[in-house]
């Protein structure tokens, strides 16, 4: 939640989407090669990110690999591209096993194309490229984690009921969206009143063991107060208050595709991961050469329609030399926060939807 909160502060009126699973997986790979204070910071941060995962679902190596049986439509993959000019330690290579490949970073264009092709393949063609800028001549290693999720709704929306409706970007700005309609579905729902405002939470299940949770403020511009006040603990408490209601749900079809990846370096530094960047970085368990994290890139894609939700995310790290009851009607027609989660306790994706793209 903390990375998401930092991002939405920087992107106030923009659509935001991240995959905590992808980010954590990348940090875990870095931790395999970290030593000293760098390892201490990474281990502590990974432990904090992993706090809300049930003990029996945690990985002994702190890798956030989501169990396929628990979320059958989720695919995760990691890849480490290391310079063929560096001799990496055998102990590090043993930990990352088949996910490592040597490349020639001096042949920058060929290596860039190779990496982007892997990203495209792992995300089922939904993210065509992670690397949009030329590679630095100082690049020594790139760590990438890709997540692709596609799930059918348990209660599909009827296509013939989809219609054009208003979506309020703010009180003064209105646009139109394709509004999907789901009728007479038994969904988990709660309305919460907090000091900072009222809002509804609705849990919309997919086939299998995953769902999309939407937090919809009562006020058209109420999302800003939720952004400021939401925490993992509060969200867990609110979800514990959900109960089954018969609901007619009106929800926009939406698609979010990023034009440029986020560079998470400043955010991770703000959150205490200062010793993986710059002079104090210690990745001596990877190799004898002094290397540090130069960029921490993260990009995502989501497509929500009547039949399914499809989401992809990629995180990349560049190392260089120095997410019978009466029927209610719920209209999702203004900015909201959404999460996709599985029943293992993992938040696969978390986002904010402000306007149609």
From Swiss-Prot:
Entry GO terms, CC: extracellular space; host cell cytoplasm
Keywords: Host cytoplasm
Compartmental location: Host cytoplasm
Presence of the UniProt keyword Hydrolase in the record: no
One family name in Pfam for this protein: Serpin
GO molecular function: serine-type endopeptidase inhibitor activity
PROSITE patterns named in the record: SERPIN
The UniProt record lists the keyword Glycoprotein: no
Stated role: Plays a role in mediating viral host range. May act to inhibit a caspase independent form of apoptosis to allow efficient virus replication in infected cells.
Family to which this protein belongs: Belongs to the serpin family. Poxviruses subfamily.
Protein name: Serine proteinase inhibitor 1
Source species of the chain: Monkeypox virus
């Amino acid at each position: 939640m903390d990375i998401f909160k930092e991002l939405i502060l920087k992107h106030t009126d923009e659509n935001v989407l991240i995959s905590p699973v992808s980010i954590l997986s990348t940090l875990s790979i870095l931790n395999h090669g970290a030593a000293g204070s760098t390892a201490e910071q990474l281990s502590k941060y990974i432990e904090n990110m992993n706090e809300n995962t049930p003990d029996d679902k945690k990985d002994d190596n702190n890798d956030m690999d989501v169990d396929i049986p628990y979320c059958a439509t989720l695919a995760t993959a990691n890849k480490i591209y290391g310079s063929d000019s560096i001799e990496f330690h055998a102990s590090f290579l043993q930990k990352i096993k088949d996910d490592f490949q040597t490349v020639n970073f001096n042949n920058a264009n060929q290596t860039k194309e190779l990496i982007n092709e892997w990203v495209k393949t792992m995300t089922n063609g939904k993210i065509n490229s992670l690397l949009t800028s030329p590679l630095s001549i100082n690049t020594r290693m790139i760590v990438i984690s890709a997540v692709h999720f596609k799930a059918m709704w348990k209660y599909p929306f009827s296509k013939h009921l989809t219609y054009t409706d208003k979506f309020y970007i703010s009180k003064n700005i209105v646009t139109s969206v394709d509004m999907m309609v789901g009728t007479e579905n038994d969904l988990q729902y709660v309305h919460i009143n907090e000091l900072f405002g009222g809002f509804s939470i609705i849990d919309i299940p997919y086939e299998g063991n995953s769902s999309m949770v939407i937090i919809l403020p009562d006020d058209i511009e109420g999302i800003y107060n939720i952004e400021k006040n939401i925490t993992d603990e509060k969200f867990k408490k609110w979800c514990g208050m959900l109960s089954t209601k018969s609901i007619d749900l009106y929800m926009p079809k939406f698609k979010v595709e990023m034009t440029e990846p986020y560079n998470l370096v400043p955010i991770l530094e703000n959150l205490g991961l200062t010793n993986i960047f710059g002079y104090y970085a210690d990745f001596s368990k990877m190799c004898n050469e002094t290397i540090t994290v130069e960029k921490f890139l993260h990009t995502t894609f989501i497509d929500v329609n009547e039949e399914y939700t499809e989401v992809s995310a990629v995180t990349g790290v560049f190392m260089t030399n120095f997410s019978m009851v009466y029927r209610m009607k719920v209209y999702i027609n203004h900015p909201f926060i959404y999460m996709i989660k599985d029943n293992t306790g993992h938040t696969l994706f978390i986002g904010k939807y402000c306007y149609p793209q």
